[in-house]
Amino acid sequence: MPKISSSFDAGAISVIDSTDSQNIRLALRGDNAASFSQWFYFRLQGAAYQPCRIRIENAGQSSYPEGWEDYQATASYDRSNWFRVPTRYEDGVLTIEHTPLAGSVYYAYFEPYSHEQHLNLLGDAQGSGLCQIDDLGSTAQGRDLNLLTIGHQAASDLKIWIIARQHPGESMAEWFAEGLLSRLLDHQDPTARALLDCATFYIVPNMNPDGAALGNQRTNAAGADLNREWQNPSPERSPEVYAVRQKMHETGVDLFLDIHGEEALPYVFAAGCEGNPSYDARLAALETAFKTALRQASPDFQDEYGYPKTAPGQANLAIAKSYVGETFGCLSYTLEMPFKDNINLPDDDFGWNGQRSLRLGEAILSAILAVCPQLRPDETA
């Protein structure tokens, strides 16, 4: 008889009935302390070579039901190699149809990035000899919140801050961080060397380790959406934002990137600070220059489709990119990657995945280097 389980790092699903491989009935499980639901990650055993129909019956009540349209679930036999499987969304039900070729197979909303991978990422970064790892404090459940500092930390250095995975179900964000770190810590990469001659990087590859381990889609263990906590974070409800924001005020910020995943739109795009009260022509020109450079660095990035522009002065300053952009008067972006495929460069077998996220992380360093000379206002003007 088929068995469904999810008692592992980031696992998340509720089982209604798994006795019939042709009618496995499941339900999305909400975040541990909030009503958000979208992420799923579970294991199926005992159905090798059997045509399986897996129905997630409450998909229509998820946080982003439009995210299921033209979506294909991911699957893996070894949790290292993930591929897309036939999936359809009808009448509020997400149906996965797949014939497993082994007795154990995993299904997930997107290719996961585990806590073990996170710890290995920190270890590899430290082993490069270029990276200082600092403890910013502990999460609500006692997990470490680490900051990676790369550069000479000279007073004159540009201060570049990059955070990822405020929303824990957006695992592509940490894949992106891995790619960025891999290139930045490459002693032989000329772009990385040029950047570290003029800038110090402050990188938080996982802002929400509790939520990631719990299998949450959007919130931390206390039920807080971290990307709505930046104006008034607290050590109790949002210790992650509280600690990172405090460190930012110590270092200053010249460029800020907040890395995310987007459920509905099948594109890579950026959202800027046009709605901030202090937004001006200099920042508008910087945004344009950065997007142009990123398009040149990676054909996966585009600027035709994205979120609607925010009206002048109407930005929500509780959102990270808006708060940081307004507070420090700097170039500040949210970068979004799709849970679906990138419709401009589709891949039927793998869709948008961890490796493509990683490659985008590598590419963004070229865009950062291109705008470095423009990041600070001309003090002599």
Where do the model's predicted regions map?
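Extended acidic/polar, glycine-enriched regions
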Residues: 88-137
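Short, Φ-rich (hydrophobic/aromatic) sequence segments
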Residues: 40-44, 122, 290, 294, ...
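A short beta-strand motif that forms part of the nucleic acid-binding face
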Residues: 58, 111, 164
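Glycine-centered structural positions embedded in regular secondary structure
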Residues: 11, 87, 137, 357-363
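Short helix/loop capping segments that flank catalytic or ligand/cofactor-binding pockets
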Residues: 64-65, 108, 115-118, 170-172, ...
